[in-house]
Design a protein with these regions (language model features):
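Signature of the chorismate-utilizing enzyme
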Residues: 1-130
Length: 130
């Protein structure tokens, strides 16, 4: 996979970027990993219009196709943004009493390109394969 990077000349606050992209494309699939701009929070990353979404749900059905850890092992290379819930622990500790939940145990989406905002250097990088 050949990755291309474009560094924008002008700084734009990630909140404004996210707001603009939401107005233009809608918020379905929008992912914004925000940071505080301190030493350990240098980057905010934004993805819009995912190419692919993978979810794992139903902690009462512990089959292999629903296992979030199997789904993570099988993803292709790319720019993925998402989360793994605390309840995914049911696949590691199935005998513990887990509460039923409608929330996904895994939600990840593939984006191409992504927008990386360096909050310390005030630099915006668009990174992708096309």
């Amino acid at each position: 996979m050949k990755i291309k990077k474009i560094v924008l000349e002008k700084w734009i606050d990630p909140a404004l970027i996210s707001h603009y992209l939401t107005k233009k494309f809608g918020d379905k699939g929008l992912a914004w990993l925000d940071s505080d701009g301190k030493e350990n929070g240098e980057w905010s990353i934004i993805g819009i219009k995912p190419k692919k979404i993978i979810q794992s749900r139903d902690i009462n059905n512990l089959d292999k196709t629903n296992n979030p850890f199997n789904n993570l092992r099988n993803i292709e290379k790319g720019f993925w943004i998402g989360w793994l819930s605390y309840e995914a622990g049911v696949y590691i500790e199935p005998k513990n009493p887990w509460k039923k939940s409608n929330m996904a145990t895994l939600w990840i989406a593939s984006y191409d390109p992504i927008i990386k905002c360096n909050l310390i250097k005030k630099e915006i990088i668009i990174e992708g394969t096309n």
